[in-house]
């Protein structure tokens, strides 16, 4: 369950632009606790254990721990409940989805050359859904300060009237900030201070006085998947080494529908009474990363693990469509809605992102066939994330480097077997990168 507190209108609107920012870095860099049932029960503390498909995502040396060939998959139910509070008004939204979050197979074989110290090898192919984006949030409340008009004014001021007063046919030629100004002007939410085509200042056409009732519905869906091509080997039954070559693919959709209404107008002038603003964002991409890892059996019971996950080099494309409708009225009548729908999907230039790498150190103690205790410590420096090339995103990258920092992660897991019953428990703590 998530609790979300929002305190100003522009935050409520959650409008999306073609502006890469810290939010995107976190969206595509952070991972959910997904994987096999055993992996999740132990909170993912598998870096020194191996022998589990999802453990390959922590330490690629773990595939050689399998004693025989295996195929496995895991289906999970995702449940999100979001509670929101906006200017004292509470709301909640629940989302459930069912998805395959792990699918893989491993082939294990012994070395027929008995004189070699390399006694065992394994190759594996595994898919992990490292992040599920299915979620929904609903926010509602009365804003005593800001109107949606403030959003459009923030983009419009400085843009000539001649740019935003054209017809829909030139909408696709406008920059993002010009498109927002266009939508606000064409729906009569904002007006120019005069009719000169060179005018660059605008005013709100929404009645002043506050008490703006606002709703925002945000629905997201998609996944961040990783397909790992794995190879590992065991040396003298003590040292295990492995490598993953990972193909990444991401699919993210976000739809927002913002509504605002007021009854502030007490004059005969026509002012905006209601607004509905819809945004549909689709982001998709693919990329590459690699992992190397080792597990060492210090004794029959005690194991140590160390793994490195490289940065992920991704290439993304954003597609965005927007529409808006506004209803104006005075004390005597209400006009028909002014609807602005360019019926155009903007496909922006692809951009590249480098997510941060990660180092994981692990230790585990195995009590024969009775049980085990396992601990993982991971460190990830989010300040190393960046959009590339740097010359095009210098301001954004400077912000990432200055605002984000190191995030430490601790995972602890335990298992105890009673005949055919396994009792499992785990604990995971991950610091905020801020």
Label the predicted regions.
Residues 1-23:
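Bacterial Sec-dependent N-terminal signal peptides
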Residues 9, 66, 253:
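Active-site-proximal flexible loops/turns
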Residues 12-13, 69, 421:
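Alpha-helical transmembrane segments and their juxtamembrane interfaces
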Residues 20-34, 39, 108-434:
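Outer-membrane beta-barrel porins/channels
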Residues 37, 49-58, 64-137, 142-143, ...:
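Outer-membrane beta-barrel translocator/receptor signature
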């Amino acid at each position: 369950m998530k609790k979300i507190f929002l305190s100003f209108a522009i935050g409520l609107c959650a409008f999306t632009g073609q502006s890469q920012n810290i939010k995107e870095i976190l969206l595509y860099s952070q991972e959910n606790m997904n994987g096999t049932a055993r992996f999740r029960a132990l909170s993912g503390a598998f870096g020194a254990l191996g022998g589990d498909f999802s453990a390959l995502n922590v330490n690629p040396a773990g595939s050689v721990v399998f004693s025989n060939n295996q195929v496995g998959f895991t289906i999970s139910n995702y449940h999100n409940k979001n509670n929101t509070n906006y200017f004292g008004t509470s709301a909640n939204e629940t989302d459930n989805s069912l998805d395959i979050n792990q699918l893989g197979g491993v082939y294990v074989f012994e070395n027929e050359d008995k004189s070699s110290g390399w006694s065992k090898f394994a190759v594996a192919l595994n898919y992990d859904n490292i992040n599920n984006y299915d979620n929904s949030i609903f926010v509602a409340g009365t804003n005593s300060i800001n109107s949606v008009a403030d959003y459009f004014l923030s983009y419009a001021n400085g843009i000539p009237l001649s740019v935003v007063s054209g017809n829909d046919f030139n909408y696709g030629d406008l920059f993002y900030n010009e498109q927002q100004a266009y939508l606000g002007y064409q729906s009569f939410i904002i007006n120019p201070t005069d009719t000169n085509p060179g005018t660059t200042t605008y005013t709100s056409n929404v009645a002043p006085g506050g008490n703006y009732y606002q709703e925002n519905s945000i629905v997201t869906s998609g996944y961040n998947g990783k397909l790992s091509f794995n190879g590992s080997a065991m040396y003298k039954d003590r040292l295990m080494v492995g490598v993953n070559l990972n193909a990444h693919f991401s699919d993210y959709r976000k739809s927002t529908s913002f509504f605002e209404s007021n009854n502030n107008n007490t004059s005969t002038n026509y002012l905006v009474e209601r607004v509905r603003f819809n945004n549909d964002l689709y982001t998709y991409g693919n990329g590459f990363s690699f992992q190397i890892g080792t597990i060492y059996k210090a004794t029959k019971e005690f194991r140590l693990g160390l793994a490195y996950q490289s940065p992920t080099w991704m290439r993304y494309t954003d597609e965005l469509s927007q529409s808006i409708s506004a209803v104006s009225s005075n004390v005597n009548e209400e006009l028909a809605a002014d609807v602005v729908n360019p019926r155009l999907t903007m496909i922006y230039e692809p951009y590249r992102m480098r997510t941060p790498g990660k180092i994981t150190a692990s230790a585990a103690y195995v009590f024969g066939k009775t049980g085990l205790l396992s601990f993982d410590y991971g460190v990830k420096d989010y300040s190393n994330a960046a959009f590339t090339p740097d010359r095009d995103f210098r301001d954004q990258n400077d912000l990432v480097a200055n605002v984000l920092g190191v995030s430490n992660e601790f995972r602890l897991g335990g298992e105890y077997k009673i005949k055919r019953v396994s009792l499992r428990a785990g604990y995971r703590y991950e610091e905020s990168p801020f």
